[in-house]
């Protein structure tokens, strides 16, 4: 975000705090039964009062009128219940309906000191005729991670229905899917709810409980919410016992903190069985705890006096009678000394090429940083896996072997930036028939927003005949328009050329989504380097739309002049709900009107996604053709 953006964000934060939008609270009713989820309001809840959304957003539809859209939230010991009702005789099904209509997003947040938070789950629900639609029910954003990659379990249920002249949207969200959030274990929780109502001409209006630019803008670092107050249970049909690990990452020799929450109809002693297995399913601990229950809500914090000596992934399983009352994965980390690790690398830096040293130093720093950022309720399994891989590479290096020699699957390298001395990564993939005596064309592929470059090259982006690299955009939302992004791309290319047999006369730049704009922007910066540009699900004017005016727009003739001598490949899905197909079609028209050769693939059935097999086949043939000239 630019300096101007940070200033505007600061002003926005002050407005939220002064206006007190997060100072209210909503009281959430306790349910002693599990609602039936069919899209209709559960019949036992028809007398509960529904709330209206506080804010209405017509967006670019000034004639749009506000509808009376209501919602109801309640909870059980195992689930959060949500019902939304709209006055309509049909449901509109669109890609990413939670933004494009009809659909909604639920934010569950952990309050922080400044009334905004960067600890949250942003959960998306997009009604769909296909119940297996990938974005039907999904954790869209977690602690500002924007991975869009975590599905909700089958214990979370979502249905929609049209009945009696209205549309109902009903959710039963499993607390286990939003761990550690739970009304009986969390000191306080907050929420926001946003509903996108589809209207004519593929447009939508919006409704929210509190105003929060983060609903639409992934660059907003903190989110706004309203506190939740959960009603204490007045009566229960049966006793409830829940076991919870208060930490899901520990060090070797640490004990296990277990929190037992009990809610009982009577006073009784209940035995609790706790079993811990390693990742090979071998039992390493099997013990029993007697829990004294009383006719009230109780917390019993227990620390298991058992030390695990070996780092790894473990599984916690707790039962009471025939009931499973707690089931968690947790990770035991070794005790690290990163200063000693870096010292070993530097002391041996002259044994192998300097880029291997840079890569190992980058990986050591990355693991240390991620461990520091790890929350108590997160396992850190990916960090442990990353460390084990790094440890293997380090041992190979200390034996004077290059751990990266001969790898043809995608892997990460790093260079030391000559501009700020930071270690910057990129992912590289070599052809299966790679030989250091043969020269290869180079494909530079730029990733999308809110993510890094890891995983981009897991699918071939060139048909397998190119050396492929995916530079990391350290400013993950700036459309590759900053000096640092352009310098990082150039330094990644220089690093590859220094260590691999690249034919520098046969380079192509490509990108997906934000990376599509980045490909246009990067070619514009260095047209002398590339034989062609490929734009996948991109936006030719994205920087001006996201960052404000003053950036190259590739819908303007002045910025298209450098493209006159090279071919351009453009792919887009007509159902793309993230970046509209109209912009891609306008780009194609502008390129052609400027005499630029365009290969276009506008697919009627595709959304915001990578190309289909047929498009890839055409694209790979295009790559081969333009680099053989």
Model-derived regions: residue spans:
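Short beta-strand/loop motif that positions the catalytic acidic residue
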Residues: 570-572, 576
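Short beta-strand element of the alpha/beta-hydrolase
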Residues: 438-448
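A domain-start/cap signature at the N-terminus of enzymes
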Residues: 296-297, 311-313, 322-327, 331-440, ...
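Short amphipathic alpha-helix adjacent to the substrate-entry channel of hydrolases
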Residues: 454-471
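Mobile cap/lid helix-loop segments that gate and shape the active-site cleft of serine hydrolases
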Residues: 455, 525-566
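C-terminal catalytic histidine-bearing segment of alpha/beta-hydrolase fold enzymes
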Residues: 577, 581-629
């Amino acid at each position: 975000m630019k300096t101007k953006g940070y200033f505007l964000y600061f002003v926005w934060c002050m407005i939220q705090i002064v206006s007190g939008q997060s100072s209210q609270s909503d009281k959430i009713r306790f349910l002693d039964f599990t609602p039936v989820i069919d899209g209709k309001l559960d019949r036992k809840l028809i007398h509960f009062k529904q709330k209206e959304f506080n804010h209405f957003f017509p967006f670019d539809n000034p004639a749009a009128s506000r509808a009376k859209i209501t919602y109801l939230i309640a909870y059980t010991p195992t689930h959060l219940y949500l019902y939304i009702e709209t006055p309509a005789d049909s449901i509109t099904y669109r890609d990413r309906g939670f933004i494009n209509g009809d659909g909604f997003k639920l934010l569950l947040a952990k309050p922080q000191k400044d009334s905004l938070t960067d600890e949250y789950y942003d959960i998306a629900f997009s009604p769909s005729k296909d119940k297996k639609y990938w974005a039907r029910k999904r954790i869209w954003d977690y602690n500002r991670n924007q991975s869009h990659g975590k599905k909700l379990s089958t214990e979370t249920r979502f249905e929609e229905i049209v009945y009696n002249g209205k549309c109902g949207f009903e959710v039963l969200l499993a607390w286990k899917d939003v761990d550690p959030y739970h009304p009986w274990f969390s000191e306080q929780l907050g929420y926001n709810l946003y509903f996108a109502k589809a209207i004519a001409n593929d447009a939508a209006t919006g409704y929210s409980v509190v105003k929060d630019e983060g609903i639409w803008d992934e660059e907003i670092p903190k989110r706004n919410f309203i506190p939740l107050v959960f009603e204490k249970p007045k009566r229960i049909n049966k006793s409830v016992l829940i076991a919870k690990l208060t930490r899901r990452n520990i060090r070797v020799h640490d004990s296990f903190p277990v929190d037992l929450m009990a809610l009982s109809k009577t006073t009784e002693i209940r035995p609790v069985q706790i079993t811990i297995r390693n990742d090979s399913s071998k039992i390493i601990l099997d013990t029993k705890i007697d829990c004294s229950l009383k006719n009230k809500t109780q917390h019993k914090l227990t620390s298991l006096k058992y030390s695990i000596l070996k780092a790894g992934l473990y599984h916690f399983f707790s039962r009471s009678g025939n009931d499973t009352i707690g089931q968690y994965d947790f990770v035991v980390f070794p005790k690290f000394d990163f200063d000693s690790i870096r010292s070993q690398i530097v002391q041996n830096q002259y044994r192998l090429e300097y880029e291997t040293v840079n890569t190992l130093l980058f990986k050591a720093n990355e693991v240390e940083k991620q461990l520091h950022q790890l929350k108590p309720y997160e396992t850190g399994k990916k960090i442990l896996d990353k460390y084990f891989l790094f440890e293997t590479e380090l041992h190979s290096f200390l034996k004077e072997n290059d751990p990266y020699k001969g790898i043809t699957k995608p892997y990460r390298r790093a260079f030391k930036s000559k501009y700020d001395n930071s270690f910057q990564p990129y992912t590289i993939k070599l052809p299966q028939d790679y030989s250091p005596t043969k020269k290869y064309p180079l494909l530079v592929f730029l990733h999308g927003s809110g993510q890094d470059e890891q995983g981009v090259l897991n699918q071939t982006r060139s048909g397998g005949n190119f050396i492929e690299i995916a530079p990391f955009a350290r400013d993950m939302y700036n459309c590759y328009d900053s000096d640092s992004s352009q310098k990082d791309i150039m330094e990644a290319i220089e690093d590859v050329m220094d260590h691999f047999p690249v034919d520098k006369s046969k380079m192509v730049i490509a990108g997906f989504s934000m990376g599509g704009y980045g490909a246009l922007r990067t070619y514009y910066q260095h047209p002398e380097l590339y034989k062609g540009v490929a734009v996948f699900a991109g936006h030719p004017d994205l920087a001006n739309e996201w960052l404000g005016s003053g950036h190259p727009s590739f819908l303007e003739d002045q910025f298209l002049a450098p493209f006159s001598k090279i071919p351009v490949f453009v792919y887009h899905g007509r159902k793309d709900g993230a970046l509209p197909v109209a912009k891609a079609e306008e780009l194609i028209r502008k390129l052609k009107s400027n005499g630029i050769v365009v290969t276009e693939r506008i697919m009627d059935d595709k959304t915001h996604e990578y190309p289909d097999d047929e498009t890839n086949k055409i694209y790979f043939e295009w790559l081969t053709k333009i680099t053989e000239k």
